Amino acid sequence: LQDHQVFGDGVAVVTGAGAGIGSGIARRLGELGMHVVVTDISVSRAEKVTEEIRVKGGSAQAQVVDVSKFAELDQLANEVFEQHGEVRLLVNNAGIETLGLTWEIPAERWEATLNINIHGVVHGARAFLPNILKSGKEAWIANLASIGAFAAMPTQAGYTMSKHAVESFSECLHLELELVGAPIHVCSVLPGMLKTSIFEEEGGAGEPDGARRHRAKMRELMAKHGMDLDEGCRRIVEQIAEGNFWVSTQPEMTAQLIEARVEFLRSQLPPKLGEQARQLICD
């Protein structure tokens, strides 16, 4: 089925939809005809994306949510079901990047990274699933992992380990829903490099001083090699609609990383840092 057939109506909830991939997915779903609940920790960002959807004839509402607080996700789920009675698509997208050596990153930044990137996904699914299951209708849950879910990267340990966790959670959730015979599709979304604001300087609050230079390098790399955001999000929505478990913006890159990961696991040797990655971090 094509995306306009699957997501031509119904309600979608997208977390972290005020910027980056979340905003691109929200806009695409609005174009297709869904009512989009645009959630973000920033009211101004959520309202901006909501207005962008409405200007193009779509239907959307803005909602302020901090996904690191499970009570706010519980409240969001209750309010959405009270207002609309259904959710066809839940996109657990909210996430932050954290750069720096493990022992130099403050405890507060570690807690924020893991709470947003892991617990935000888990509690998003936990909060919405009871009512989705009760409806008995076909639905979709898309969790944002990353191609980093199949790699190891020093100075990005928090982000990388969180994406490994999201991938593992998505696999387990898929099996659990299959176990109970629920008509719910789970997707693990594996974006490659897209042109987003994830490496902007304001996102680095609480990181060690040395991380600023790394952020600048990643911004340059993204500007040069990143895929257009709207094109990447169009591919994501299209593959979710097709029922793919793994959803990839750049399949060849994903396949290369998976092959390298399999070789690493088979070897049972310690991980090694490639020369390109070393230059990116150390130069």
Where are these regions (language model features)?
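Conserved glycine-rich Rossmann-like NAD(P)H-binding loop of the short-chain dehydrogenase/reductase
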Residues: 34-48
